[in-house]
Amino acid sequence: MVVRYSLLMKVSFAILIFLVGCNENATSSNDQYLTDPDISEQTKKPSRPIIDEKNKGVTDTSVTIEWDKIECEKNFSHYNVIVYRKDRIEDVITIRTRNNSVFIDDLKPNSQYSIDVSSCLHSACSESAKIEFITLNEIDYYHTTEIEKNVYGSLEGEVRFVQTHVISPEGRKNEPEIITGRDALILFKPSIKNSSSILMKIYSEDGLTSKVVMKSPSMLPKTDQPIDIDENNKVVSYSNSYWSAEIPWNKMKSGMSLHFEDENGNLGIIESERIKFSAPSELIIQNIDLGMLYKPRGRNIVIKELERTAVDYFQKVPVSKLIFSDYTPIHFEKITLPNGSVYTEKSADIGGWHQGDMREAVGKALVSTGINNANLGIVASSGYSQQYNRLTNHITAHTNIGYYNNGVVVHGGSGGGGIVTLENTLHNEWSHELGHNYGLGHYVAGGTSHGPDTSWGWDGYYKRFIANFDWKRSPQSNIRPDNQEVVKPFMDKYTYLWDAMSGGYDHQNGIISRYTLHHPYVARIIQDWLKNGAVVINNDYMVWDELKNIYVYKGTNFKVPIKKGVPVVTILGVYDPDKINPSQLYPPTYSNYGNIFDLEKPRSESSLKGWQYVKDVNYLDRVNTHWHTMLVNRKEEKICRFSYLSPKGKKFEFLGYEDIENKICTGSRSIHYLEDGKKNPIESKYNDYFLLSIDGDGEISYVPDSTIGESKICSLKMSGTVYGAGFIKGNSCRQIDGVFMNGFQWAFTLNQSGVNSTYTWSNECVLKIKDKDNNIESISIPNYRIEKNQSNKIHLNISREKPIIDINVYCGEHELTSIKVSDNPDIKLLKGPIIVGQEHGYTSYEPKLPSGWFKHYDNFEPKNEINHELGKMRVNDNDEYICRFNFSDSDREMKFVGYVSQLSESKYICTGGSEIYYKKNDINIELSSKENDFEWLSVRDKNLIGSKIEFDNNKTLCVLDNRSFYGAGYLDENNRCTQDRQIHWSNGKQWLFSTYKTMTYH
């Protein structure tokens, strides 16, 4: 029951937790007189409600409050709720309800209200609990948007799905489709605003799966708007009219329908046919830092903050699962290019952001393409090739620096074909260059700017909307390059964002995201590209069938990994099977996420070589050896050789084919030796001939007779009845004079089609890997140049189960290159893989440390899995952990912020280092804590996201970020970064700076 004392106000009360009423037989353990029969009914009073501040939601026009419900007190009747506006006492709302929450709509913005709540028995009410609030002075982004009805029934309205973007359920061409297997926020707006509570029921093809009480519009999640709002701007909310609820990833699949019911029994339904699901795509991004003839920069933020960046980028790309993995950095101290050039000091080329021979051959071709190929079981490719053998959605991003003829050059700014070359792994450079990998060009559709008709984004980890405009940039219109469209700023206050492929933005927009929010039209193109990628399921490659909404088998020539997503050693190098260019193996790089394959073993381990006398060839030799063949009547037959003696004593070596059934070497009936006009068949004695193995060294030859001498062999590859093999003489492939076929001397010019004049031994190439137990694994690699004008490159994964100590490359008996492998300490610093989505959720990013400053405790170590939670500052080109301790000089005590220095295992101090000291009476005093007696700083806190971190006593923490100075302090009244006035830099001046950065929680 609601009694209104103002006609200007409309009220609806919400049931956030559906109650079916109390059990009248129950009693309250907190109210002893309720069970005392001697106390008069008139004196009984129920418990006073306790209002839950955490579950309070306030917008500009509505409020939701919740309180502890009465646990079935005997004779419980209802709650009385009285709402009034402080500056207009006559506007009073009285609500009578049995539910322990209330939703009140149509309030006045920027006004102060008070709410009294009391619990009542049939005879008396408790004392009132009071809460006051001020409605917000905010802008609702979608407050004027008309309903696009897609929910039908007595509770009709509009439903929208929120994943990377706020989208319609039916699947439109200009926005992403719903992602199968990914969490979603559901927004529901009834056509008529008279509901006080809404229950959402989730149905699958098997029936009802779950029920969720929707949150009222005043409890809609917040946005990514910065906390320090400009005084000229208002708080912006996404909407003040949507009810919301979350659906977990495992219920998000085809066949789902949603039912919405209000407290009056009204029902609205969106059927499964109106909900279009797309593929549960997966994306793998490998990350590596490179230095070519120069030490790697060590500034790859994705690698340094793998957990945070993975979660952040997951919000921008329409996938069901995202995997970020890191490789150990590579310092190329010597470089061999596929053209044979060798660099030990600097490249002979001119380097630039977009140019340089090492940039192309090493960073892109060898490393990024190499890692991609290694994870598909491809062991080698041509040296300069950047071919993207795309099967799965696997991309390798690298940061790269090189020493060139014009000096040290940082590369960046390119992407595509499974490769990303970056200087900055944050902001638009990352989003833009990854976009090229998804098939996107510059200025998609002539240039895509967000606008009033494009959707907002969503961060599923922080549960906040991501605005499609710039929070801090001065308002201006966006004009497409073709001048065909002008997008004016929102409310003349906020400039709309450009898509990543149309300029994007190179700063953090809002309190959450460091990557660009894609325009929904562009996001759909990305989604269409991603859904074509295969995944490995049950030892097969599978692709998504959009008609069946299931994964189906994909036929492919690529190897299927025998182990997926395991720790690997990736071996990279350059080799020349022709032994013309120099070859080189590079120090291996390591990752915790890669694929292992059953790679081809060398034939030479079990294969015979050269000419083999048939009596010495056993069954296994025949099976394991690859034999040279020729075409006989459209069938490949083994080439053989034997000594022929004519009836009149002519002796020569004859090349024929093996008749395996009769165990002879023959030329068949079509080939004969003509002597004195008589045709003599040419065939060996039983089991008395030689077979020719592919394996060996050099060109293949034989001696037809003593007068001709050693000659190279040749054969015919013709489809008709002409066949045979012989020797090369002049410009012909021939046999001994007198050998005829079909009435003609067996002789053919070399330049005609079907004559094979190049026979060489295979000169098999092998990569040999020795582990610490001296076990050797041999892997076959191509024994020929894949491209004639360049060396090949090697790229393959092996297991990390046993450390390796030696790697060698052989072609035939020749060792082309080798490398001794030592322990790599960077393996311990690997953080990956970070897997986001599906059953993994955001577990890899959940905080493990307390928020803010915390005391060092026994056995605490800043390990890989938590170091992203700790605050850091740059000290002499290194990132050091921020710390704080109490410093005393006998006269006074103060807080000092420095950095952590490790003395030995499990022993740390907080220090100012060699450049910062405390000055007293012209004496410089070292700033250093006692051993393990200081505080660390944790910068992770979901609830404080975007809030500035305090130094102490409400002073804002500030940190220097330049090469010349270091340190941390607090902001003084003049907005300078300082510490105590007696803290000085080594130049004798007070530690006081006007250039700094503040730190916020994330």
Swiss-Prot record:
Cofactor(s) the protein needs: Zn(2+)
E.C. no: 3.4.24.-
Signal peptide start-end: 1-21
Cofactor note: Binds 1 zinc ion per subunit.
Lineage: superkingdom: Bacteria
TM spans (from-to): none
Entry GO MF terms: metal ion binding; metalloendopeptidase activity
Lipid attachment site numbers (S-diacylglycerol cysteine): 22
UniProt-annotated binding residues for Zn(2+): 432, 436, 442
GO cellular component assignments: plasma membrane
Keyword Lipoprotein annotated: yes
Domain Fibronectin type-III residue range list: 45-139
InterPro entries per the UniProt record, alphabetical: Dictomallein (IPR051256), FN3_dom (IPR003961), FN3_sf (IPR036116), Ig-like_fold (IPR013783), Peptidase_M66_dom (IPR019503), TagA_dom (IPR022218)
Ranges where the Peptidase M66 domain occurs: 282-536
Lipidation (N-palmitoyl cysteine): 22
Active site (record annotation): 433
Region (Disordered): 31-53
Any one of the GO BP annotations: proteolysis
Record's subcellular location: Cell membrane
Name of this protein: ToxR-activated gene A lipoprotein
Gene name for this UniProt entry: tagA
